[in-house]
Swiss-Prot record:
This is A-kinase anchor protein 7 isoforms alpha and beta. The keyword Plastid does not apply. It comes from the Eukaryota. Residues 86-104 have a biased composition (Polar residues). It comes from Homo sapiens. Targets the cAMP-dependent protein kinase (PKA) to the plasma membrane, and permits functional coupling to the L-type calcium channel. The membrane-associated form reduces epithelial sodium channel (ENaC) activity, whereas the free cytoplasmic form may negatively regulate ENaC channel feedback inhibition by intracellular sodium. Residues 18-40 are annotated as: Required for apical membrane localization. Pfam families: AKAP7_RIRII_bdg. Signal peptide: none annotated.
Length: 104
């Protein structure tokens, strides 16, 4: 069975590296580039096919960039100092309980 890869970035590696430095600024820049529906309207008030394809590609690109941003934020939060503090307090609690048990 084939596997689906969620990182088809051959040409967009620069965009990923931009996310590492200022992810929210990059996403804001892309969201400003999305035009309103009036730019490619047909007579019936609907956007033409080329406009829909272009907007669909942009939406997918934005979704992927947001997913990468979320991943980077989550991995950076895991590596921050202070994560081990919960382990230290658990160890201190266990030591405190052991001392109380020894006194009884």
């Amino acid at each position: 069975m084939g596997q689906l890869c969620c990182f088809p970035f051959s040409r967009d590696e620069g965009k990923i590296s931009e996310l590492e430095s200022s992810s929210s600024a990059v996403l804001q820049r892309y969201s400003k580039d999305i035009p309103s529906w009036s730019s490619g309207e047909k007579n019936g008030g609907e956007p033409d096919d080329a406009e829909l394809v272009r907007l669909s590609k942009r939406l997918v690109e934005n979704a992927v960039l947001k997913a990468v941003q979320q991943y980077l934020e989550e991995t950076q939060n895991k590596n921050k100092p202070g994560e081990g503090s919960s382990v230290k307090t658990e160890a201190a609690d266990q030591n405190g309980n052991d001392n109380e048990n020894n006194r009884k």
